[in-house]
Amino acid sequence: MTSPMPVSSAAPVAALPLAPLGHGIFALDSGYVRTRFDAVHLMVEAGRAAIIDTSTRHCVPQILAALAALGLEPADVDWVILTHVHLDHAGGAGTLMAALPSARLVVHPRGARHMIDPSKLWQATCDVYGTAEAEQMYGRVDPIDASRVVEATDGLVLTLAGRRLRCIDAPGHARHHIVIHDEASGWVFAGDSFGISYREFDVAGRAFAFPSSTPVQFEPEVLCQTIDRMLALNPEAILLTHYSLVRDVPRIGATLKRLTQRYAQIGLLHEHAGTERTARIRADLAHLLSTELRAHGVTLDDARVSELLSLDVPLNADGIVSWLDARSRRSPTPPQPGPSSPSP
């Protein structure tokens, strides 16, 4: 995958993939992986700004260009808020904070230490991808001075020129995840906790979303509880990192909960499949999502659907495997196969 090209800080709005969404909120396409895959959201209120998720280090020039295009200086940013510390959301945070003299970083207490000293987070990434590929995808991750980091405990309220932003603990996708409820618009910035919804899968203005079960902290039951907590806020819209604004929130929330339960069922079906476990989960997950997309009315050909899901299916399957392994560690003695149990 290629890194987005740097953008001049003087670039006009028309030259940037910057979309106004309403209520002083803008979506910036980071260019990570492909277009309309990864969004950085900016909020502007009375000349002050907040940035929700940063994408990777490669996106920082675009974020600074977006601020300039909106008539803002780097010193006008009060908050950089991370929904969680996966690097497609937080990889650029340290580099961006170095360019924003007035900003403070807001992050879940479990993620704060990884932003202050990202060495373990970065090493784990390099262990998975190799250093060269990790740098190509994310760039290096810069540390942030602890004095500039605010731990987002559940219920913490931030203010942006008097506009209240409430941070809400949101485990299930990751234990270091928060969502942010903007009380002015009623909208919720959900990161990955309200799933993934690619605009290519929209049908007649109706979005399709599916859960993100990225390893290694996917917890299906907990994720459903987090979805319920967001639904209880009765938001008119929810903003996802992948990709941006969705409406018809109750319908999408019900779909996400149903599919989260199906993810768990697929995992349990193949829990004792040995060396075939991951491959079987991956195949069933691909079939599930393809079937759901057809039922939604998506008419893209199979090759295009597979291409759009090419990162998510293996990653989500790995997350289901991580969940199964965590269950096994908590209950090390597996149940004996019975008449209705899957064969080992």
Task: Mark where each language-model region is.
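C-terminal regulatory/interaction regions
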Residues: 2, 265-344
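Metallo-beta-lactamase
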Residues: 4-10, 56-58, 115-171, 175-239, ...
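Residue-level marker for buried hydrophobic side chains located in beta-strands
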Residues: 50-52, 81, 105, 187-189, ...
